């Protein structure tokens, strides 16, 4: 007589789900068919069908590192399951994690993931990226990855803000700070509903990733120390990415709200609220010598930009030993901008370069087919009467840059729009940079 293996027998006879490796202390695996049990642990979600769900133990205190449990849970839930991080619980991550093996997995974050603030450890143990000397606690990769829930991903950034005060990230950064969430070689990754809090550096960085979507995510970086504000805590950044969708976002970070970096294409942004940011920026690109960078096919609509340094911005590097490329086919539509230093900006003298050096070594990034449509609000007056500052590089092609129905005011007087070295006009009256007082 043929006997089924015990795991198959139990599954067939009793519907019991058998873990792929032995359970670790505090863990649980609930079959998708156990509706009542899933409901009891908080694993059901109105938008997503039930799946086999894995839970792990929560941290007992701020020093109780559950990194190995978290990694185990992801491996158990991989290939069709779900990892649940329970509401009201905190899961402390104190070791770097390579999560680039994921395939068809859901992470339901209802509690809080919190990283330790051991600066010495993280600066010695991280994943390093040459681009702007970036590091991260962990990296996510694979395909068909969904992260959703009402929980918090907490970078525990206050100690990093305090230690970093007075230092500079570009170009001479030596004080590396981790990125809160990084994807690398990922395809079809979505994040929905969660809060991302107090990243030490950029909040999100997508690298070599296709089809990334964020919806209804709140990103916030704040300091409890008035002398050490968060720095370089961009909301969203990308490098070598095709296919981006950011919808219904609230971002309050003190740096770029959204800033696609080199070779990001096919971007859709809708219903984004940005407070205290450096704006929705295309770039910077053209930083590295001999490299061609592209940002192309971008549609941004229904965005509110409040109390920021910049509003709608395009930025490209100038100077010796920089690169080249293009920013092409970008639409900013239905944008409200209030109390912002520079509401509309084309900056081709980026980064930290004086006017003499920029004139000697101008940017080689072409800016083409840019539309600013239905833009209204006010500047802060910090740049005088200027509400739009579009100064193109004499060594670049700048054409088909259009302002349509732009109604921006300045508290310093009649609003001025600056434009230089743009071929064919911009659709409205503008003056040369040399004729204005800043």
UniProtKB/Swiss-Prot annotation:
Name of one Pfam family that matches: Glyco_hydro_28
Source organism, top-level taxon: Eukaryota
Subcellular localization(s) per the UniProt record: Secreted
Repeat found in the keyword field: yes
Active site: 255, 278
PbH1-type repeats, residues: 209-248, 295-316, 327-348, 398-430
Signal peptide residues on this chain, from the entry's feature table: 1-15
Disulfide linkage: 257-274, 392-398
GO molecular function: galacturan 1,4-alpha-galacturonidase activity; polygalacturonase activity
Glycosylation sites: 118, 185, 225, 263, 275, 302, 329, 354, 366, 400, 407
InterPro entries the UniProt entry points to: Glyco_hydro_28, Pectin_lyas_fold, Pectin_lyase_fold/virulence
GO CC annotation terms, alphabetical: extracellular region
Annotated EC: 3.2.1.67
GO BP term, example: pectin catabolic process
Record keyword Disulfide bond present: yes
Record field: catalytic activity: [(1->4)-alpha-D-galacturonosyl](n) + H2O = alpha-D-galacturonate + [(1->4)-alpha-D-galacturonosyl](n-1)
Keywords (A to Z) from UniProt: Cell wall biogenesis/degradation, Disulfide bond, Glycoprotein, Glycosidase, Hydrolase, Repeat, Secreted, Signal
Function, as annotated: Specific in hydrolyzing the terminal glycosidic bond of polygalacturonic acid and oligogalacturonates.
PANTHER family recorded: EXOPOLYGALACTURONASE B-RELATED, PTHR31736
Family as reported in the entry's similarity comment: Belongs to the glycosyl hydrolase 28 family.
Name of the protein in its database record: Probable exopolygalacturonase B
UniProt source species: Aspergillus niger (strain ATCC MYA-4892 / CBS 513.88 / FGSC A1513)
Biological classification of the source: Eukaryota, Fungi, Dikarya, Ascomycota, Pezizomycotina
Gene: pgxB
């Amino acid at each position: 007589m043929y006997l089924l293996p015990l795991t198959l027998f139990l599954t067939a006879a009793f519907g019991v789900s058998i873990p792929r490796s032995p359970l670790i202390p505090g863990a649980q695996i609930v079959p998708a068919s156990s509706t009542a049990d899933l409901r009891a642990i908080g694993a059901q979600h109105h938008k997503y069908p039930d799946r086999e769900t894995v839970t792990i133990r929560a941290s007992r205190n701020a020093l109780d590192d559950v990194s190995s449990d978290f990694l185990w849970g992801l491996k158990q839930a991989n290939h069709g399951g779900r990892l649940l991080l329970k509401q009201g619980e905190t899961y402390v991550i104190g070791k770097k994690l390579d999560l680039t093996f994921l395939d068809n997995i859901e992470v339901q974050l209802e509690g809080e993931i919190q990283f330790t603030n051991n600066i010495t450890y993280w600066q010695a143990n991280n994943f390093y990226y040459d681009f702007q000397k970036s590091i991260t606690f962990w990296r996510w990769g694979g395909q068909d990855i969904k992260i959703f829930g009402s929980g918090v991903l907490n970078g525990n950034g206050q100690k990093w803000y305090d230690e970093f005060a007075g230092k500079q990230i570009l170009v001479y950064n030596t004080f590396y700070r981790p990125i809160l969430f990084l994807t690398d070689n990922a395809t079809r990754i979505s994040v929905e509903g969660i809060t991302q809090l107090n990243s030490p550096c950029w909040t999100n960085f997508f690298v070599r990733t296709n089809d990334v979507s964020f919806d209804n995510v709140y990103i916030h970086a704040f300091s409890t120390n008035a002398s050490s504000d968060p720095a370089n805590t961009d909301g969203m950044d990308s490098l070598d990415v095709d296919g981006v969708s950011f919808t219904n976002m609230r971002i309050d970070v003190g740096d770029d709200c959204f800033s696609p970096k080199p070779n990001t294409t096919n971007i859709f942004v809708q219903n984004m609220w940005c407070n205290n940011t450096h704006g929705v920026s295309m770039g910077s690109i053209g930083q590295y010598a001999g490299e061609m960078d592209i940002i192309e096919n971008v549609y941004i609509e229904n965005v509110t930009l409040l109390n920021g340094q910049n509003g709608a911005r395009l930025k490209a590097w100038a100077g010796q030993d920089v690169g080249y490329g293009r920013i092409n086919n970008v639409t900013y539509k239905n944008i409200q901008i209030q109390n912002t230093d520079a509401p509309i900006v084309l900056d081709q003298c980026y980064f930290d370069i004086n006017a003499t050096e920029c004139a000697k070594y101008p940017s080689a990034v072409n800016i083409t087919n840019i539309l600013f449509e239905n833009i209204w609000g006010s500047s802060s007056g910090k740049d005088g009467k200027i509400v739009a500052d579009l100064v193109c590089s004499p060594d670049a092609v700048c054409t088909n840059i259009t302002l349509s129905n732009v109604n921006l005011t300045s508290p310093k007087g009649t609003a001025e729009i600056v434009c230089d070295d743009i071929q064919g006009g911009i659709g409205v009256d503008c003056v040369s940079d040399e004729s204005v007082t800043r």
